[in-house]
């Protein structure tokens, strides 16, 4: 794991002046973990080297999981090479995997194990054992896989007993987590359905849709093919789908747009100017659209060859459907505290099933700081009030910690409890935040 050490509590020092600086954030966690899985799936053909890969708890448990499944992974961060010296799609026929609190690793490796042959068990920290995965397990059972929750409650630990994806396909709900859909899509080209006409049908609303689009774009880069019937919402994979699923020799990973949101928000809150390098509007990551919300609030947003810049301005409250960019809900919550009126965040009920119940947690902590918060099933409304510093809880949630810290850039006395939880996706966050000053 990363060698960064953290105190039990960290007081945020308000900025003496508005920042005017470029910022470089690490590689995208979402892209890194997808690329690791895609590289593993294509590694019987050749090795794939990822550049710009994020080193964090989430990506390190993914690397550990792939190694335990028998893949060769050489991690010289931010450069990672993945290979497979054996003839099997999943080299080992048995493995016990521990994914800590990494949702992407749990969902993606559950599907990867299902595409192999053998018996596998996947487990995580206590919070992971509370996060639902039954929708994915049910879909895998439709694919002919023995997939179950060890305790019978629809949450990890997960047990997989499989001879491959031999069923005709599955229907998968997307209203709990888009990662269930992405997990199935990445392994679908390797199905062993006798008819070689393997279908994945989407059922109901799809949350965080840009992450599925990210998965599709990355699969295309790896050479996968499929047909999609939009009227029926069905992906079909046939005998040709994995014929060229060999991937690139090298794959460059974008900076993390979710991480960038904290620095764009810092510009908004302080009236400063921050450019996050290496990102543009054509990013694979939907979270770059967080700057559009900031623009609606009164910020000025610019794009140049080096990155995307946010200039802070007088902030207005907004009414925002954040379903597509729900990882930035907490960031917006912090910015909303400095607006001239209420901000309503809608259509994000699914974030109650993240590292913590993010709606309830955000409401509780912003109230401590002085904001008025109305909590609803699918979101919340934040009305600014007189803010004062206090110790805030992070619920062991990296995004809660990074978002609440933004309030401390203007309000003295904000203390972050358990600041080390940022190691999940951004181990160097506190160093980079301090550099804004």
Question: What role is predicted for each listed range?
Answer:
Residues 1-437:
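Short, structured segments at the rim of ligand-binding sites
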């Amino acid at each position: 794991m990363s060698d960064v050490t953290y105190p039990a509590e960290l007081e945020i020092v308000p900025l003496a002046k508005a920042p005017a600086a470029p910022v470089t954030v690490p590689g995208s966690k979402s892209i890194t973990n997808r690329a690791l899985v895609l590289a593993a799936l294509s590694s019987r053909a050749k090795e794939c080297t990822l550049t710009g890969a994020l080193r964090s708890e989430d990506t390190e448990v993914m690397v550990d999981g792939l190694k335990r499944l028998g893949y060769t992974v050489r991690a010289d961060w931010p450069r990672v090479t993945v290979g497979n010296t054996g003839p099997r799609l999943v080299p080992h026929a048995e493995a016990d995997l521990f994914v800590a609190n990494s949702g992407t690793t749990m969902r993606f490796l559950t599907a990867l194990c299902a595409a192999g042959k053998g018996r596998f068990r996947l487990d995580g920290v206590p919070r992971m054992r509370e996060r639902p995965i039954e929708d994915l397990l049910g879909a895998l059972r439709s694919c002919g896989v023995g997939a179950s929750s060890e305790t019978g409650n629809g949450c990890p630990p997960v047990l997989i007993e499989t001879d491959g994806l031999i069923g005709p396909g599955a229907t998968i709900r997307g209203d709990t987590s888009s990662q269930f859909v992405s997990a199935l899509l990445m392994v679908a080209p390797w199905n062993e359905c006798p008819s070689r006409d393997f279908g994945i049908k989407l059922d109901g609303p799809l949350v965080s849709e840009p992450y599925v689009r990210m998965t599709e774009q990355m699969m295309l880069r790896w050479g996968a093919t499929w047909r999609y019937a939009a009227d029926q919402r069905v992906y079909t994979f046939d005998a040709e789908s994995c014929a060229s699923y060999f991937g690139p020799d090298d794959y460059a990973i974008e900076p993390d747009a979710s991480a960038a949101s904290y620095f764009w928000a810092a510009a908004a809150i302080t009236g400063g100017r921050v450019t996050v390098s290496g990102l543009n509007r054509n990013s694979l990551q939907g979270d770059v659209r967080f700057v559009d919300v900031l623009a609606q609030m009164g910020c000025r947003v610019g794009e140049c060859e080096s990155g995307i810049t946010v200039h802070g301005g007088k902030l207005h409250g907004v009414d925002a459907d954040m379903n597509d960019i729900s990882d930035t809900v907490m960031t917006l919550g912090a910015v909303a505290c400095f607006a001239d009126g209420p901000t309503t965040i809608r259509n994000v009920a699914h974030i109650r099933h993240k590292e913590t119940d993010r709606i309830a947690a955000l409401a509780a902590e912003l109230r401590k700081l002085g904001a008025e918060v109305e909590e609803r099933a699918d979101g919340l409304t934040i009305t600014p009030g007189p803010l004062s510093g206090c110790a805030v809880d992070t619920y062991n949630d990296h995004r809660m910690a990074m978002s609440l810290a933004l309030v401390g850039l203007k309000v003295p006395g904000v203390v972050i409890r358990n600041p080390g939880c940022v190691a999940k996706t951004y181990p160097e966050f506190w160093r980079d935040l301090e550099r804004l000053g």
